[in-house]
Regions:
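A short glycine-rich, Lys/Arg-flanked "PGG" loop and its adjoining helix->strand segment in the class I
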Residues: 117-129
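Conserved class I S-adenosyl-L-methionine
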Residues: 1-36, 48-52, 71, 132-161, ...
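Conserved Class I S-adenosyl-L-methionine
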Residues: 178-249
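A short SAM/SAH-binding and catalytic strip from SAM-dependent methyltransferases
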Residues: 100-114
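Class I SAM-dependent methyltransferase SAM/SAH-binding core
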Residues: 38-42, 46-90
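Short alpha-helix
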Residues: 160-176
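A short acidic, Gly/Pro-enriched loop at the edge of an enzyme's catalytic core
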Residues: 89-101
Length: 249
């Protein structure tokens, strides 16, 4: 698991920067009702996506929440007065506070399945009837684009995806949310190169391959034999799911 306090300084540049943030914000906003008045961005990170939502929808009262102090500090510098330090598993808001709740690239980071379930439960709890929850799903799978890099890494150990689409849908249903749509967007600038993937392996980005593990070095050696070491392979394509809390009465 990465330390997001340390990651904060270089987070934007290492995650596709502004092009990816723009694509994410545009797609998420396309699933937020036009009459929404209050939106919560859970796990907002450095607010690269959040600030684009604010700029595109000045009618929305937008709040961002993140647990990592480093991330929240950077987010608050971009959106003063709109960022709170909060655990997504215990959101500090009353039931039914928001017309829309989003979580972009958050669920896959949860330590275990119970934590992911708690995040979805909290997002559902603070959503008003008729509101929409929008979240990314299947993030790890999005990076498998059928490239030679993916072929080398095919045998790597993997943990069960906390954000598997079917799992997230089941969590949502358990808390009264119904499917309300699906969309996708490209992870612009995030196509992997062999040399960059080797660096990511050695930094611990692949959860079950820790720095210094002999298996990590075997995969790194396989990547080092690939041609065009600095040529990015195709960009990933991220999937977004929307869920709504039905109106009652």
């Amino acid at each position: 698991m990465l330390d997001y306090e340390k990651e904060a300084a270089g987070y934007d540049a290492s995650r596709g920067g502004e092009p990816r943030a723009r694509a994410a914000a545009d797609t998420v906003l396309g699933m937020v009702p036009a009459d929404a008045a209050r939106l919560l961005d859970v796990g907002c990170g450095t607010a690269t996506v959040t600030r684009r939502i604010v700029a595109a929808r000045p009618d929305l009262q937008v709040i961002g929440a993140d647990l990592a102090h480093g991330m929240a500090r950077r987010a608050a510098a971009r959106l003063p007065g709109r960022i709170v330090l909060a655990d997504a598993r215990r959101l500090p808001f009353p039931d039914g506070t928001f017309d829309a709740v989003i979580s972009v690239w958050l669920l896959h980071l949860m330590p275990d399945a119970t934590d992911a379930r708690r995040v979805v439960a909290e997002c559902a709890r603070v959503l008003r009837p008729g509101g929409v929850y929008v979240t990314t799903v299947d993030k790890a799978a999005a990076h498998d684009v059928g490239s030679d890099i993916d072929a080398v890494l095919a045998a790597r150990p993997r943990r069960p995806a906390r954000d598997a689409a079917e799992t997230v849908a089941a969590h949502a249903a358990e808390h009264g949310l119904r499917p309300a749509g699906q969309a996708a967007f490209p992870g612009l600038g995030q196509g992997r190169s062999p040399r960059g993937t080797i660096a990511d392996l050695r930094r611990g980005w692949f959860t079950l391959l820790t720095p210094g593990d002999p298996r990590t070095e075997r995969f790194a050696a396989g990547l080092a034999r690939l041609p065009d070491q600095d040529r990015p392979r195709p960009d990933p394509r991220f999937t977004v799911r929307a869920f709504t809390r039905p109106r009652t009465g």
